[in-house]
Amino acid sequence: MPCLDEAAALPWVLDRIPPGWRAIVVDNGSTDGSARIAAEHGAYVVHAPVRGFGAACHAGLLAATADVVCFCDCDGSLDPALLPTVAGPVLDGAADLVLGRRRPTTFRAWPPHARLANLQLARLLHRRTGLRLHDLGPMRAARREDLLALALTDRRSGYPLQMVVRAADADWRIRETPVPYAPRTGRSKVTGTWRGTWHAVRDMTAVLNERAGDGRAGTEKAGDGRAGGGRAGTEQAGNATVGSESAGHAAAGDDSAVTAGAR
C-alpha cells in the first residue's frame, strides 16, 4: 500500500486487512510517523524515497511474494476487508485484472468535478483501447508476474492508468466489481492542489498517447478477444458488497497479496 502522510488513517485501514493476509505499506517520504504506525500495526514496511504514486506502487509490487497482488489506497476511503472479493475472480482464473468500481457513500466522498474527470478519462480510455469501464479506481487485483511482464514505466500519477492500458493491449480479461467509496481521511496528495491535478493530467495524457507495445514485453493473455481493434467487452463482477481507498500491500498466505495506497 503506497503511503504518504497517512498516520491518521493507517490504524483503521490496517485493522481491516483480512485475516491471513500480509499488508505491505510503502512509505513514500512521510513526515508524520506513518512508517512507524504501519509497523506497529503489523505491516511490512518498504521505503520508496523517490516521490511518486507509481514509484510507491511499483516498490510494493516488487516487494510482494504472493502470486496474486491487490492494490488499495490507505486513506480510509476504501475498505481493505473487501479485497478478497476483488481478488476472487483472479484467484479463480475468471479474470486477469479486477478493478473496484467506486460507489460513493456520501456526496462528499466523490465531488462532481472529480466524477466528471473520471468519466472523461474512461471515455478517453475507450477511444484508446476499446475498453468500456466506468471507473479506474485504485482498488484492484492481478497476478504479480503478469503485472511485472507489462513493464510499467510511469512512476507518478499515470501508473494505475498505464496498468489498464497495457493490460488491454495484451488482451487481458478485465472486470469491474462495485466497492463502496467513503470520504478520505486527510487531504488528497493528487487532486488536493492545482499542482497535483496538473501533474496527474500530464501523466495520464502521456500514458494515453502510448502506442500499443511501447516500451514493454508483449505478454498477451488468452481470453476475451478484440473486435475491430478494440476490446470486445469488459465483464461486470456482480457479487461485491463493499470497498474503499488507501496506500499499502497485503498477501493471503502464498495465494494473494494486497498493495493499497492513497495519494
Model feature map: region roles:
Residues 8-12, 32-41:
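Acidic helix N-cap motif at the loop->helix transition within catalytic regions
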Residues 27-35, 76:
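A conserved acidic beta->alpha catalytic loop
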Residues 6-9, 30, 53, 79:
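Donor nucleotide-sugar binding loop of glycosyltransferases
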Residues 130, 152-263:
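Hydrophobic helical membrane-anchoring modules
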Residues 49-51, 55-62, 80-157, 184-194, ...:
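Acceptor/aglycone-binding surface of glycosyltransferases and processive sugar-polymer synthases
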Residues 69:
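Short aromatic/hydrophobic "clamp" motif used to bind/position activated sugar donors
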Residues 1, 13-14, 21-29, 46:
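Short beta-strand/loop segment that forms part of the nucleotide-sugar
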Residues 24, 35-63:
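Conserved donor nucleotide-binding strand/loop of the catalytic core
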